[in-house]
Amino acid sequence: MLKYINALRLPLAALVVFIHSYNTAWRGINSQVVDGLGTILSRTLPTFAVPLFFAISGYLFFINQQTFSWKGYVEKLHRRFYTLLIPYICWNVIAFALYALKDVSAGQLLHLPLSFNLFWGCTQVGGEGSNILGWHVIASTAPVQEPLWFVRDLMVIVLCSPLLYTILRYLKWLGLAIVAIVYYAGLWPNVGGMTLIGVWFFMLGAWCGMNKYDVGGKLARYWPICLVSFIISFGLLLGR
């Protein structure tokens, strides 16, 4: 399984770049061709990359953890402090500094005030709404460096991993099914600006890791079907 994960790292990273490449400059071009390509290459084909990254994170976090221990939990937090938190802070500080430099050079006030919210949810990503139960769902948010919402959510999930482990350990597939229903039915109200996408796919990967499922090996047997399905789906998208 690990060899498949290593092989996927670069392609998935490239797909994430595709997601964020269809920016304001491209959307400002009045062209149906550009709009169509942007929709397919940025908003359609690569959308599975981020969920898969969450699933891989969950798999790797729990692959060697059949039983929970606070010692192991603290060790994992210590490693994530250097691999997640420090880079997260640094890149958000750099982003804020660049935005501030732009405002100052234009003789304007800072449009982003200096506060903790720069590192949490100063940017609104989605829109507000209501779910099927009529509950109010607030907009999802991101830090000043918008793509790093993934890292923010992942850090929160890692902190909550003892709870997720308990759910999977004692409720097993039922706990996974409950989270899936809440996610796909849109019942989660985006508490703190966080969607449930990270929790759901992290738990899905964690479930595979805890049970040592060789997902990559099983899917490799069906690669011709996957390839044909991809070609057909891509053709249908182009024909829209």
Ranges and model annotations:
Residues K3-Q65, L84-N92:
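Functionally critical transmembrane alpha-helices in membrane proteins and complexes, commonly lining
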Residues P11, L45-I56, P147-L159, T195-L204:
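Membrane-embedded alpha-helical segments of multi-pass membrane proteins
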Residues A14-S21, A177-N190, L227-R240:
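Aromatic-anchored segments of alpha-helical transmembrane domains
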Residues F48, R80, L84-F96, L154-V158, ...:
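Alpha-helical transmembrane spans of integral membrane proteins, capturing the lipid-embedded, hydrophobic core
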Residues F61-R80:
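Membrane-helix interface linkers and caps
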Residues L84-D153:
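Membrane-interface helix-loop-helix regions
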Residues M155-A180, W207-I225:
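Solvent-exposed interhelical
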Residues I197-M203, N211-R240:
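Alpha-helical transmembrane segments and terminal signal-anchor/GPI-anchor hydrophobic tails
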